[in-house]
Amino acid sequence: MTTKVAANSAAYEAIVRAGPRVKQLQQVHAHLIVTGYGRSRSLLTKLITLACSARAIAYTHLLFLSVPLPDDFLFNSVIKSTSKLRLPLHCVAYYRRMLSSNVSPSNYTFTSVIKSCADLSALRIGKGVHCHAVVSGFGLDTYVQAALVTFYSKCGDMEGARQVFDRMPEKSIVAWNSLVSGFEQNGLADEAIQVFYQMRESGFEPDSATFVSLLSACAQTGAVSLGSWVHQYIISEGLDLNVKLGTALINLYSRCGDVGKAREVFDKMKETNVAAWTAMISAYGTHGYGQQAVELFNKMEDDCGPIPNNVTFVAVLSACAHAGLVEEGRSVYKRMTKSYRLIPGVEHHVCMVDMLGRAGFLDEAYKFIHQLDATGKATAPALWTAMLGACKMHRNYDLGVEIAKRLIALEPDNPGHHVMLSNIYALSGKTDEVSHIRDGMMRNNLRKQVGYSVIEVENKTYMFSMGDESHQETGEIYLYLETLISRCKEIGYAPVSEEVMHQVEEEEKEFALRYHSEKLAVAFDHCEG
C-alpha cells in the first residue's frame, strides 16, 4: 500500500511539474497508462484541469471521456476552467453533460455557467440556468446572484438585473458594481449615477471598478462636478490611478471640454496602454487641437509606446480632418497600411473623405470613394454623407444633389438624407424642389431626430431641445434669452438662417435660431447663477 501511495504521489508531482504544456502532459499521461494509473480519478482530474488551462480543448475532452463516471468535482473543475478561460460554449456544453449525467451542480457551477451565458449574451439559456439555480436551492446564493446581475446587464435586461439585485439578502460591492456598470453600459447613465448614490447611502465604499463605470456615466451625462469629485476622491484616498481609471478620467474631461485636465491625468499615469494613448489623442482631435494630436501620435511611435491599433488611427485621422492637416493625414493613412499592415475600415475611409472634402479637395475625395467602389467598399452611407457635407461647405451644389440622391437610394427612410438634399436645393435657389422634398417627407412621415443639449448645474444635469418649454423655469429662461439676444443685436448680431433646415418657413427658422437647445441651456445656467 505504501508503494502505491508513493507512486501515486510521484505521478501527481510529475503532472504539477509538467504544468499547462500539452506535450509534457501527454508524456505524463502515457506514463500513467503504462504504469497502471491511467484511470486514477484524482490524477486524471489534475491532467484535465491543466490541459484545459493550456486551451487544449480537444485533448481535454478526450481525457474527460476516459473517466467512466465523472463526479461533481471533475465537472466543476472543467466548468470553472472553461468559464475562466472565456470558452463559454464549452462551459455550457459541460454543464449540460453534467445534468444528463445526473450529477448535482453547486453554487460554484451555477456561478461559472451564468458568467459564460453573460459572455455569450445568451439570455434564453441564462434564464434557464437561473431557474435551475432557484429550483436547486441556490437562488439566493450571494455569488450566484452577483453573477446573475452581471448576466442580465450584459444581455441588456436591466429590469431583470434590478429585480435580482433587489432580492439579494446581502448585497456585496461586486453586485453594486455590476449594477452601476450595467446601467452605464446600456446607455442609462442617470440610473447608474443614482445607483452609485444608493450604494453610498447603504454604507458601501466605492472601489476602482465602481469609479470606472461611474466616470463613464458622468462623461455620458456631462456631470463634470461629480466626475471631478471622483478624481479628488481617488487622490485623497491614495487609490492607484491604474490604466482603466486614468483612461476613464481622460474620457470624462474630454467629453466635458477640459483637454488640459485630460492631459494632466495622462501625464500622471504611471502605466499606459493603447486605450489611454488613443483617448488622449481623441481628446485633442475632438476639440480642434489637431497638431497636438499628431505630435502625441508621433511620440507614441518614437518613445516605444504601445503599438497603435485601428481605433488609434481613427482618432488621428479624425483630428487631421478637423484641423485641416491634409499632408499629415495622408502620411498617417499610409503608415497605417504600409508600416502596421492594418486594414482600413469604414471609419478610416470616412475620415479620409472628410479630411479631403473639408480642405476643398473634392475631386480627390470623390476619386478616393470610387477607388473603394471598385473593391466593393463604397456602399457605406457614411462615406457619401461626408462627401455631401464637403459639397455643401464648398457650394458644389450639382455634385451635392447627385450624392444626396445616391444616399436616399441607399437609405430611403433616413430623414437626414432628405434634409440634406433639401438644404442643397435651397442653397442653389431651387425652392420648388425644396417644397417637393418637404411634401414627400410629410407623406412618408419622415422626421429628423430631435437634438438635445445637456448642461450640469449644481451637480444635476438638465436636458433641453429646441423650443423646449418643459422646464419649470421656462418663463425666466426665455425672458433672459430675449434680453440677451436684444443686446447682441444692438452690437451687430444677425442670425444666419441658411444653417437651419431649409424646408421650414422663415419664421420657423427665426424660432429655431432664437430658441436653439444650446442657447436655452446656457440661459438656464445664467438664470441659476
What kind of region is each of these model predictions?
Residues 1-172, 181, 190-201, 205-529:
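Terminal (and in a subset, N-terminal) low-complexity or junction segments at the ends
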